[in-house]
């Protein structure tokens, strides 16, 4: 189960992608400013609210499972000491809160990913970052989304080919090299064909993008982002 | 659709090819996140992302290599499943892997700058083995320096604790990746003109 855009008509789906990005940044700021038990309780409600607003659920967090061991392990490492008292509870608690904060950030990010199609993300990026860097980011991000599945398939094919030829008997370094050579040569040939195709189709610095507009439905999200920013600034100041 | 009335401003041939390569390398680093190998010293598997970072610096040079990894981060933040374990989202850029992720563009630029001795690309056949290995060792130092600093800041750990929690188990595998990258650069199958 990977986390990806799921079509829908939830509140989060109807928001402008820029409001959702602002909410995420503001949430991160406020989460770092208020890493206290009380602050995190409030932020848990906000984070769960965001995920519910995107029609998401616990299964959307499954793709973050590789992060969980470190988050669980870190408080234990922080608490452990060599020599008496062997385990310092307050150090473990500080890191435990920090770990939980990271989990909340992932929940809010999951809500964005679930509710935002690629072309809207791209348009948001390109309209926020001005000029050619914005176009570069926008086009590049769209191409990464497009080519990731193809390159993943290339790598799987390479690994299968290596295995079929008893490559699993080879050393780990050699197996890594074979997979990398396979992936890289496919990626380079795809890139060269793509570059030629882009030029042939009048690839321009100023393409036409889908229209984005803040609407009334964005007001609560923008207000939430502003409130969280204000809270974070107040705390730091 | 929004309407644009200005005239079309074409992207040049070279820039278009470089952009395509940067995007493909970003996608390749993402695809490498799914390729796991058993770790020699720990039950946690290692992925090949760092190898992708090295290769981006070596094959694209400091400017486009760095730009490629910026694309990787942007695509991941906007929802492409390119981060560790196929995850995505802005949360990763401010979470416990933040240090590692933000180090990638810097590391690719550093590797590229050392290998090519500046911003203009030179023929990889003329690059000596010590330069190649030195560049990647430096890149590894950058990645783990940022990564450990990120763990310390995000999870309020001390330096030793951060190394124990997120670096010690993976560092030995980096030597394998450096060796594999040398093999890739010296391979006849890759002809990047």
Q: Can you name each region flagged by the protein language model?
A:
Chain B
Residues 2-23, 161-193:
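Alpha-helical transmembrane segments and their cytosolic interface
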Residues 2-66:
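Hydrophobic transmembrane alpha-helices
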Residues 2-8, 17-24, 31, 92, ...:
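Short helix-perturbing small/polar motifs within transmembrane alpha-helices
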Residues 25-29, 65-80, 147:
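Small-polar-interrupted transmembrane alpha-helices in polytopic inner-membrane proteins
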Residues 33-37, 76, 111, 115-119, ...:
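Membrane-water interface at transmembrane helix exits
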Residues 34-45, 73-107:
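Interfacial aromatic-anchored transmembrane helix boundaries in multi-pass membrane proteins
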Residues 65-69, 101, 132, 162:
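Alpha-helical transmembrane segments and their helix-entry boundary regions
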Residues 80-86, 150-164:
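Interfacial helix-loop-helix junctions of multi-pass membrane proteins
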């Amino acid at each position: 189960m990977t986390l990806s855009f799921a079509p829908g008509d939830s509140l989060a789906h109807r928001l402008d992608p820029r409001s959702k990005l602002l909410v995420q940044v503001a949430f991160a700021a406020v989460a770092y400013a208020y890493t206290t038990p009380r602050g995190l309780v409030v932020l848990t409600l906000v984070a769960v609210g965001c995920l519910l607003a995107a029609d998401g659920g616990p299964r959307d967090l499954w793709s973050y499972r590789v992060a969980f061991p470190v988050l669980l392990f870190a408080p234990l490492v922080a608490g452990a000491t060599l020599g008496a008292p062997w385990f310092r509870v307050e150090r473990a608690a500080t890191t435990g809160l920090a770990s939980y904060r990271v989990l909340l950030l992932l929940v809010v990010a999951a809500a964005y990913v679930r509710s935002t199609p690629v072309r809207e993300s791209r348009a948001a990026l390109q309209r926020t970052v001005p000029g050619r860097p914005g176009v570069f980011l926008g086009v590049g991000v769209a191409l990464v989304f497009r080519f990731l599945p193809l390159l993943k398939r290339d790598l799987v094919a390479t690994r299968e080919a290596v295995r079929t030829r008893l490559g699993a008997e080879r050393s780990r370094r050699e197996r890594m090299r074979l997979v990398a050579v396979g992936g890289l040569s496919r990626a380079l040939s795809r890139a060269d064909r793509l570059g030629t195709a882009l030029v042939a189709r009048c690839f321009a610095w100023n393409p036409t993008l889908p229209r984005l507009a803040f609407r009334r439905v964005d007001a609560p999200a923008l207000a939430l982002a502003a409130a969280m920013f204000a809270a974070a600034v107040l705390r730091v100041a | 659709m929004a309407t644009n009335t200005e005239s079309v401003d074409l992207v040049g041939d070279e820039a278009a090819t470089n952009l395509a390569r940067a995007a493909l390398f970003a996608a390749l680093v993402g695809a490498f996140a799914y390729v796991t190998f058993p770790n020699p010293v720990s039950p946690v598997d290692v992925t090949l992302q760092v190898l992708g970072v090295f290769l981006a610096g070596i094959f694209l040079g400091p400017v486009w290599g760095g730009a490629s990894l910026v694309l990787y981060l942007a695509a991941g933040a906007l929802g492409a499943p390119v981060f560790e374990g196929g995850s995505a989202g802005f949360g990763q850029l401010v979470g416990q892997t933040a240090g590692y992720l933000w180090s990638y563009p810097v590391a690719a630029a550093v590797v590229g700058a050392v290998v090519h001795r500046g911003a203009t690309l030179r023929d990889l056949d003329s690059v000596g083995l010590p330069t190649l290995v030195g560049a990647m060792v430096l890149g590894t130092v950058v990645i783990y320096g940022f990564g450990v600093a990120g763990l310390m800041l995000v999870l309020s750990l001390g330096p030793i604790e951060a190394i124990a929690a997120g670096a010690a188990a993976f560092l030995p595998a980096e030597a394998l990746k450096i060796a594999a990258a040398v093999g890739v650069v010296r391979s006849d199958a890759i002809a990047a003109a």
